[in-house]
Regions:
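Long, internal low-complexity/basic segments
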Residues: 99-116, 121-179
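C-terminal cap/loop subdomain of S1 sulfatases and analogous C-terminal strand-loop tails that border
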Residues: 1-117
């Protein structure tokens, strides 16, 4: 039996099935979430704050909701984008000029994100073209946000219950190792 603290449903039927493809028709999407804290991201007087996002991925779309879109997703540039380890690629991207032709590559990697993002995974699997602002897809964006919000509320996610600040003000507990 599952522990009372655990949520969700068993994935075992999919693992032991002799068929391939979608085994359970109810499993037609995935919910993802992230609360990433970084010593290089601030928000006013708050230090080491989260970059919270939640997403819903179905057969066609990836919908992302960035709850604090005014924050830098990879950490503040003035602190060295600390949520991205040093590498030749990071060095190359951070040395690009502010010329619009080059700036887009920096922004795709380190720039601020809009509140909502939508990618067509069948036609743009690399998630390069954000379609959230396309008026022709406004109904799709609204439908996906409603589905995501409904499921997050059912799970008790503080970000959709108006209690998201709990992630930014909660005390951080550190392990102490005795010699």
């Amino acid at each position: 039996p599952l522990d009372d603290q655990m949520t969700g449903s068993s994935f075992l039927p999919q693992l032991v099935a002799s068929d391939s493809g979608r085994i359970d028709a109810r499993r037609d999407h995935t919910i993802l979430g992230k609360e990433r804290h970084d010593i290089g991201r601030t928000d006013g007087e708050l230090l080491s704050v989260a970059y919270p996002s939640r997403a819903l991925r179905n057969d066609q779309y990836l919908y992302i909701r960035n709850f604090e879109s005014h924050r830098w997703p990879v950490g503040n540039p003035e602190y060295g984008l600390l949520n991205c380890d040093g590498s030749p690629t990071k060095t190359f991207l951070t040395n690009l000029t502010h010329d619009p032709a080059e700036k887009k590559w920096y922004d795709m990697s380190f720039g601020k994100r809009p509140k909502e993002q939508l990618f067509d995974m069948q036609n743009d699997p690399d998630c390069v073209e954000d379609l959230a602002g396309d008026p022709a897809l406004a109904e799709t964006v609204n439908k996906l946000w409603l589905q995501l919000k409904t499921e997050l509320k059912a799970q008790g996610d503080p970000r959709v219950l108006g209690e998201g600040e709990i992630f930014d003000v909660r005390e951080c507990f550190r392990l102490r190792v005795r010699p």
